[in-house]
Amino acid sequence: MITFRGDGLYNSKFDDIYFNTNEPLIECEHTYSSVLDEINAKFIVVAEAGFGTGLNFFSTVLKFLSLNSTELHYIAVEKYPFKKSELREIYLKFEILKPFFDEFIEQYEILDGALIRIKLLNERVILDLYFGDILDAFDELSFRADAWYLDGFSPTKNPDMWSKEVFDRLSKFCKNRAKVRTFSSAKIVQNRFLEHGFSIKKLKGHYKKREILEASLEHSSPKILKEPWYALPNISKFSDVLIIGAGVAGLAAAFKFKKAGFNVCIAEKMSEAATNGSSNLAGILMPLITKPKVALGNMHMSAFLFARHFYANSPFADFCGVYDYGVNDLEKTRLSLWDSEIFKFENDFEPYPRAFIKSAAQIRPKELCMSLASEFDIKYGYEFESIEKSTGGYVVKFKNSKNIFSSLVIFAMGDVSTNLFQNVFADEFMQLSSVRGQVTHLNKVLNLNSAFSARGYMCKDVRGIQVVGATYDRNDNRSAARATDDEKNIDSLSEFITNLDVKVVGSNVGFRGYSGDRFPIVGAVHNASEFKKIYKSLLWTKHSKNNEFAVHHENILISSAHGSRGLGTAIFGAEILLDIALNRPVCTTNSILNSLNPARFLVRKLKRGLVR
């Protein structure tokens, strides 16, 4: 589909070129990124329909670095993405972009119907890249841009890109006084802008292009949310953050908020960090692979891809790859349906077909948490008791009779979050439970180059110990290790370690929070009492355009119920909370964000008329 022809990179599907080979970067700046000269803002949001090769993005990065702005947030949509190998070939011709491209391509993966986030230049540049149709992107994303680039081939070659339906939505994703640049100056494009409230002017084109278009929108259009009960909160101004819980979820959030410039205090009920589900010697960072485009699978894949960047330079991460075995027909089918560069499927392998996830990693959670904890003055022995609204924030009371004031509070309490919703936030419909998991420490049994997951999982050895696991016992609060559980863990790997000298040298028990639908609980804490009032008729009004927006407990967030894949989702959740707190575009789709929303169980009951 993609070839170099004459003076440009050619796409046979659209019978059109991506860019001219004659000074392509200069052309990109002239046509698109020069619009940044007209934007006087420290935080710039640029959106692009038609990411293509990414050349406009890199041109915008270069332009951004020449300005006094502090952060560039670039949101792009691409329906027909290039593979990694294709992009590497293309960018051999752009030596000036090599430092940016190398950082970009390490994080780039194609995930159809989903969003990936890529960070460059110590997070000064954020790229959110959605793979899919532009109209689907309008449903799945929430942002307003200072500038838009419409670069989806010419109207005659790609009419869907320039349809009335696209322009009907465009103004709802623009800030006041937003600018829109297009390479095409066709009459149909001019008319589309004028019909939708934009003013237009023609600018001189570059090289052989006579003219381009710039459209301006003085006043953006209001958005109508399809599901206003999942509306994001309005976070009040804050400077300090209290995080309750010092496991992976709490410490990841602390790390991100501290890096963003906030004063962070951590309160932990135990005498050290990572005493619960985060306490294992070793664990695996890998996605849950479902059938393609399944919401749960997309969420886990998005979380996995994002978390890799967090762990990239960590001494506690070994990017050794992970084998995921399809131990039954259902799992084999799931693995075989993907056409992805993320993993390679081997159908004829014994004892089971397997996928090799090259960029998966083995993590040492306990050591990771202790290292992160050393960066904070953590208040140990602080077990949460209650929270009270106060002027400018909250007074949080602990069972040791101590109080902490903070203007923003994040709960990351793992499996005890059930009590939080029942006793503090009055949501009796929250589906959260505690699950006991025991892992077993073996003497080094197998000389592994990569960890693997089958009926159970086995890690590479850490200082002569191999971690295998794990049991799953809901509502079992016994903290002592059990020999019978060690036997279960060993039996779950019997097809791999039969006739080997297996010795149990230790065990570890942890308790994890799980939700009723297997998605984590991440987002703003809803005001359940207000929900029950304003949505009491939701059974009949759920399709109405007049429903009120969600009401939240001001400046209270949560990250919980990360289950057995918290090494990925806890990092993902921390980024989501930071996005919400900063009121910036969120790192995932609306579908996934709604699936994580703490109010979702209450909303489902309200929709069915089951709340009195």
Swiss-Prot record:
Residues 1-218 are annotated as: tRNA (mnm(5)s(2)U34)-methyltransferase. GO terms for molecular function: oxidoreductase activity, acting on the CH-NH group of donors; tRNA (5-methylaminomethyl-2-thiouridylate)(34)-methyltransferase activity. It is found in: Cytoplasm. Residues 244-612 are annotated as: FAD-dependent cmnm(5)s(2)U34 oxidoreductase. Disulfide bonds: none annotated. The keyword Metal-binding does not apply. It catalyses: 5-aminomethyl-2-thiouridine(34) in tRNA + S-adenosyl-L-methionine = 5-methylaminomethyl-2-thiouridine(34) in tRNA + S-adenosyl-L-homocysteine + H(+). Its cofactor is FAD. InterPro entries: FAD-dep_OxRdtase, FAD/NAD-bd_sf, MnmC-like_methylTransf, SAM-dependent_MTases_sf, tRNA_MAMT_biosynth_bifunc_MnmC, tRNA_MNMC2, tRNA_S-uridine_synth_MnmC_C. GO terms for cellular component: cytoplasm. Keywords: Cytoplasm, FAD, Flavoprotein, Methyltransferase, Multifunctional enzyme, Oxidoreductase, S-adenosyl-L-methionine, Transferase, tRNA processing. The keyword Endoplasmic reticulum does not apply. SUPFAM superfamilies: FAD/NAD(P)-binding domain (SSF51905). Its EC number is 2.1.1.61, 1.5.-.-. Its main location: cytoplasm. In the N-terminal section; belongs to the methyltransferase superfamily. tRNA (mnm(5)s(2)U34)-methyltransferase family. PANTHER family: SARCOSINE DEHYDROGENASE-RELATED, TRNA 5-METHYLAMINOMETHYL-2-THIOURIDINE BIOSYNTHESIS BIFUNCTIONAL PROTEIN MNMC. This is tRNA 5-methylaminomethyl-2-thiouridine biosynthesis bifunctional protein MnmC. It comes from Campylobacter fetus subsp. fetus (strain 82-40). The lineage of its organism: Bacteria, Pseudomonadati, Campylobacterota, Epsilonproteobacteria, Campylobacterales. The gene is mnmC.
